[in-house]
Amino acid sequence: MTRIKINARRIFSLLIPFFFFTSVHAEQTAAPAKPVTVEAKNETFAPQHHDQYLSWKATSEQSERVDALAEDPRLVILWAGYPFSRDYNKPRGHAFAVTDVRETLRTGAPKNAEDGPLPMACWSCKSPDVARLIQKDGEDGYFHGKWARGGPEIVNNLGCADCHNTASPEFAKGKPELTLSRPYAARAMEAIGKPFEKAGRFDQQSMVCGQCHVEYYFDGKNKAVKFPWDDGMKVENMEQYYDKIAFSDWTNSLSKTPMLKAQHPEYETWTAGIHGKNNVTCIDCHMPKVQNAEGKLYTDHKIGNPFDNFAQTCANCHTQDKAALQKVVAERKQSINDLKIKVEDQLVHAHFEAKAALDAGATEAEMKPIQDDIRHAQWRWDLAIASHGIHMHAPEEGLRMLGTAMDKAADARTKLARLLATKGITHEIQIPDISTKEKAQQAIGLNMEQIKAEKQDFIKTVIPQWEEQARKNGLLSQ
């Protein structure tokens, strides 16, 4: 027995230097960093994909800014305490992706790379530079830190390398070679049984759009992007998932409710609608095949309204004329908008009534079931309206979600009336004048003059520094 112990000790003593040497040697000869093959400068690919590039560049014509808060000031109250109450414009062309996220009041006016209200994740759907940085630094390296850290790096507008494997021989030959450039999107597709590599061509066409046109949240300390699809893709499934992990995007400053903010869930709503169920893809409607001057077919990258290309989009499947289909879509849009406004009115009252209950001394336990109803009502409303095309993608699902939102909001207000009565408040809670965006912002205590002044200073001083640094580093062509 003693001999065995001695031999074991001798063997161990001989192995220690070996392990030490091997460990040190491994550190010294670590595999080189993976080469960065993502080229973010979109103009690089103009020679091979000339027509596609020019049509993509034409998204700069989609330049109109539409102020959604001015159109509907109720939104300011629903998002009280959240950056969306400051500024929310309807989407413009892809050519404005970087400009719009830089200039929105939501991203604040950071003075340095560690300053500002938002995380790096807020760049994730804006630029092929995101794919480049993820390849270069890994996901943890990319997501780490504040949004301002990415300013000098994320400078090219949403484009080629977001959807295509631009480093592949196939792409160099003029073929599409689609890819999921965001690893978190690939994981989400796998979670719902749709691994990209095994998907058919039609599925892949919509999946690349679904990297960004989708609901997501910021997870963990690094605020990494994750899709909440673990329990399914319907509004109730995602609501259940968020409740299970006790996630909230922010706390409404009036009702003190932990809230959820839907993003832009076009992939989910398209999947639930008649087009998705019949494998009519995003590309079929928004990026149809068109002819160039020589008669050659190519995919139009000026992503837009299908009615603008009726003969190449809707008319491929529908026998009705353009006017007839536009009438149907307009009626659906009006129905959804009418119910949307009714839900918003209920939620506005619920937030102010909840504030009155809290001011009257309502306890956390008394407020919990009410706040749950407000949270769920607004989540369902938001998922329906955040997808700007739901009247086309899934009108029935949109109306269903808004209907359940109305029920939840009514439940909250019924409970609030009972609770307020126990506090001696039986009169109607007065709502301040929120008839304009400015009045609504004043009602929730926003100092918009200061916020706008700080942003203008940021635009004039910080953004030029970012662009100068990007040019020095070869990240911008001009």
Curated annotation (Swiss-Prot):
Residues given in the record as heme c 3 binding sites: 94, 209, 212-213
Cofactor: Ca(2+); heme c
Biological process annotations from GO: anaerobic electron transport chain; nitrate assimilation
UniProt catalytic activity: 6 Fe(III)-[cytochrome c] + NH4(+) + 2 H2O = 6 Fe(II)-[cytochrome c] + nitrite + 8 H(+)
Keyword Heme: yes
Entry-linked Pfam families: Cytochrom_C552
Binding annotation for heme c 5: 275, 314, 317-318
Cofactor note: Binds 1 Ca(2+) ion per monomer.
Pathway where it operates: Nitrogen metabolism; nitrate reduction (assimilation)
Signal peptide: 1-26
GO MF annotation, one: iron ion binding
Family: Belongs to the cytochrome c-552 family.
Annotated protein name in UniProt: Cytochrome c-552
Lineage, top ranks: Bacteria, Pseudomonadati, Pseudomonadota, Gammaproteobacteria, Enterobacterales
Gene name as annotated: nrfA
